[in-house]
Amino acid sequence: MSNKSNDNGRAYEFAFINELGRIATQNQNINIEKNSSYYVVEKSWSTLSDLEKEKYTKSAIAGINLITSLEPIIEDGNGVLNLKIQADNKGELGDIRDILIQRENINWEIGLSLKHNHFAVKHSRLSHKIDFSEKWFQLPSSQNYWDNILPIFEKLEIYKKDKIKWRELSNKEDCIYYPILKSFIAEIKEKYDKYNSIVPQRMVEYLLGYFDFYKIISQDNKKLTSIQSFNLRGTLNKPSKKRKADIFIPVANLPTRIIDIDFKPNSKNTVELYLDKGWQFSFRIHNASTIIEPSLKFDIKLIGVPATIICLETPWEE
């Protein structure tokens, strides 16, 4: 993502945590942890115009109204309600939640992953130095995979030294994207043939993290806030002592089988993955810089989810 997109995402986190603190303050004690990550998102918020701040606030309020209907402990619990912005590097460690909401006295915690005008799941990379199979599945990549991709990335290393720009490569899809993705597909198939259900399960855990969460997406052009539940371990949607949630969130199961993985029709830079239980992903590979570098970035999206992933939308109040 661009620096502007990153700043917008951080500003949205600031709007959300502060509006949540304001709304939830009624009849209870709130603690917003002022850690280094909080000051980073506050700085991004300060770069917005007044009109942008108004939009972000409206989106946050709409999302908060939905979250409190799904999680009654936010408003009904005893003790201090702690709110915390997580550091960006948590995602590399398997925790993609941006905001944590906690009640330490009852050992309760939920997490939110916030997106501003985009639906990407993750932006992983492929390179000659990254063992994606080890990172995704905890299974080292095969020698065949390295033998196929290393010559391509060595060529990119030479282009980098010559300061050649990506736009100057007229055949990058045929000579770079397609063969790298072909090796990527072959490696996943090889691992699945050998290790079966471990591969799809660990892939989804890598992409979505090891903690349950709600994904909250601000769609500014539609003036909508969307929420998706990722309740893979049954930790979301708990009742408070006073009431149950307004909407029931079922537990979603991890996949156990790869149905198919192949190139998207008529594409040389996008792979589609179909798993059982309704999970579907797309992996679009692209360059993320002007000058060629020996590293390529994925734009990974969920294009299909199980019926147990609840998707809700709410319009902003004018």
UniProtKB/Swiss-Prot annotation:
Q: Does the keyword Nuclease apply?
A: yes
EC id:
3.1.21.4
- Please name the GO terms that the record assigns under molecular function: type II site-specific deoxyribonuclease activity
Q: Is Aminoacyl-tRNA synthetase there in the keyword field?
A: no
| InterPro entries cross-referenced by the UniProt entry | Restrct_endonuc_II_HaeIII (IPR019059)
What keywords are annotated for this sequence in UniProt? Endonuclease, Hydrolase, Nuclease, Restriction system
Could you say which residues form the signal peptide? none
Which reaction is recorded as catalysed by this protein?
Endonucleolytic cleavage of DNA to give specific double-stranded fragments with terminal 5'-phosphates
**Alphabetically, which GO biological process terms does the record hold?**
DNA restriction-modification system
Question: Which is a Pfam family this sequence falls into?
Answer: RE_HaeIII
The top EC class is hydrolase
> What is the name listed in the Swiss-Prot or TrEMBL entry for this protein?
Type II restriction enzyme HaeIII
Q: Which organism is it from?
A: Haemophilus aegyptius
Q: Point out the gene that encodes the protein.
A: haeIIIR
